[in-house]
């Protein structure tokens, strides 16, 4: 595994986990 790939994967996971509740909240409202 490359450090860059790991960093990108971590960034995607964090952004997804932080944006999902917002998207769900907006669609729910």
UniProtKB/Swiss-Prot annotation:
The 4 large subunits of the cytochrome b6-f complex are cytochrome b6, subunit IV (17 kDa polypeptide, PetD), cytochrome f and the Rieske protein, while the 4 small subunits are PetG, PetL, PetM and PetN. The complex functions as a dimer. The keyword Repeat does not apply. Keywords: Chloroplast, Electron transport, Membrane, Photosynthesis, Plastid, Thylakoid, Transmembrane, Transmembrane helix, Transport. It is found in: Plastid, Chloroplast thylakoid membrane. This is Cytochrome b6-f complex subunit 8. It is a single-pass membrane protein. It comes from Anthoceros angustus (Hornwort). The chain crosses the membrane at residues 3-23. GO terms for molecular function: electron transporter, transferring electrons within cytochrome b6/f complex of photosystem II activity. The keyword Nucleus does not apply. Belongs to the PetN family. Coiled coil: none annotated.
């Amino acid at each position: 595994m490359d450090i860059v790939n790991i960093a990108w994967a971590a960034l995607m996971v964090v952004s997804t986990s932080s944006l999902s509740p917002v998207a769900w909240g907006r669609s729910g409202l």
